Amino acid sequence: MTTTINADTSVGGAIVTGDTSGQLGLQADGTTLLTVAGDAVTFNKGISETIYNLSGTALDPANGTIQTKTLSAGVTLSDSLSSGESLVLMLNGGVTYSVIFPPMTWVTSSGNAAPTLTANDTIVFWKINTTLYGAYVGSYT
């Protein structure tokens, strides 16, 4: 279904702007929040991401692109990312409990090797086509 929005349409205090070149904008209180031109989206204000406390084992960005997990036992994580998706995982307790990662390619200076976890770790996951990638960002206190 295609919906046509006319330029300078106001909905709930937000204004949608457009021009003949196909550029689309979203304004609130007279400030442009984002602009869509061709295949580029420009954000003029901050982006707020959902933070999710991962209680299960599925790495799924639909729950939030920043996730936290505190381990109370060993865990086997599973891949629920689609191509083009990514997420950040802040993991607590990896030095105490075993963590088994899904099949993936680790991006490291020493080659395709999973990190040695500490008490508190940050890892970024992303998927291109069918390949899951991971990069160890580092530990935190």
Predicted stretch roles:
Residues 2-44, 139-140:
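Beta-strand-rich receptor-binding modules of extracellular spikes/adhesins
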Residues 42-105, 119-120, 124-141:
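Exposed extracellular interaction/assembly regions and N-terminal maturation sites
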Residues 105-111:
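A conserved acidic, glycine/proline-rich C-terminal tail/linker
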Residues 77, 111-115:
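Beta-strand-rich interaction surfaces with strong enrichment in secreted/lumenal proteins
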Residues 17-19, 82, 116-118:
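Short coil/turn motifs at beta-sheet boundaries
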